[in-house]
Amino acid sequence: MTAQTIDGKAIAQSIRTQLKEKVTARKEAGKRVPGLAVILVGADPASQVYVGSKRRACEEVGFLSRSYDLESSTTEEQLLSLIDECNQDPAIDGILVQLPLPEHIEESKVIERIRPDKDVDGFHPYNVGRLAQRIPVLRSCTPMGIMTLIKSTGVDTYGLDALVVGASNIVGRPMSLELLLAGCTTTTCHRFTRNLEQKVRQADLVVVAVGKPGFIPGEWIKPGALVIDVGINRLEDGSLVGDVQYDVAAQNASFITPVPGGVGPMTIASLLENTLYAAEQYHDEA
């Protein structure tokens, strides 16, 4: 068996095309375009790349894009003050603060300062709580994008044994909640997990997000399993690889995401979807 590749790039482009059409329809109906504020603190090269991609995607679909590039010496109070301004700005539907932040700024305080109805990253405790209670509104972008990828395969998730490797607040934990909502029997693995190999071998659906190249050997993948690789790791030769040993895993899996071109583009597509959702559900005038 050779796995079918889930083309995240093509699916994300399709979503962006649909969003562009919706923005055009909004303008024709006399409504304003959705607005996204993107805040970057410091000059982390990876963060600069991510932020650049998000801003370009915004402009491509016709959103208003506000950019705030702050020095790494920016104080926590200055950042919170900027968030307050964006919270009050009626042209802004979504606020994104690129993580990680410099060490002197407390991430949880920043995330909680963003109004829940403008939290298009889906990190605010209110939005995570909504997902936990099975009434999601603004959902975490990477898990949301992954669910779109899974749906694209046509695989029925109800009753599947799903395994999430990695328990971060950004991917692993909300991903486990999304899979529960999709009817999976879900196990979350982390650094204290014992018998990881045994758990992977039993899983019908595996999502790996640990940030370690080739962390899951391909031969561990159960024949016919669906594999979602969230990892993006740059090797010394400059090539990008995922957290799963792709070549061997692709011989066992029924569907697999490539790296690059799998999950990455979907995260940005989901961010755009959330921004339009916030505009329509929360901020449009009745």
Curated annotation (Swiss-Prot):
Q: Which reaction does it catalyse?
A: (6R)-5,10-methylene-5,6,7,8-tetrahydrofolate + NADP(+) = (6R)-5,10-methenyltetrahydrofolate + NADPH; (6R)-5,10-methenyltetrahydrofolate + H2O = (6R)-10-formyltetrahydrofolate + H(+)
Gene Ontology CC annotation, any one: cytosol
**UniProt-listed Gene3D superfamilies:** Leucine Dehydrogenase, chain A, domain 1, NAD(P)-binding Rossmann-like Domain
Has the keyword Oxidoreductase been applied to this entry?
yes
The UniProt annotation places NADP(+) binding at G166, A167, S168, I232
What pathway is this protein a component of?
A: One-carbon metabolism; tetrahydrofolate interconversion
What InterPro entries does the annotation carry? Answer: Aminoacid_DH-like_N_sf, NAD(P)-bd_dom_sf, THF_DH/CycHdrlase, THF_DH/CycHdrlase_cat_dom, THF_DH/CycHdrlase_CS, THF_DH/CycHdrlase_NAD-bd_dom
Record's subunit section: Homodimer.
Protein name listed in UniProt: Bifunctional protein FolD
Organism whose genome encodes this protein: Shewanella woodyi (strain ATCC 51908 / MS32)
Q: Which gene encodes it?
A: folD
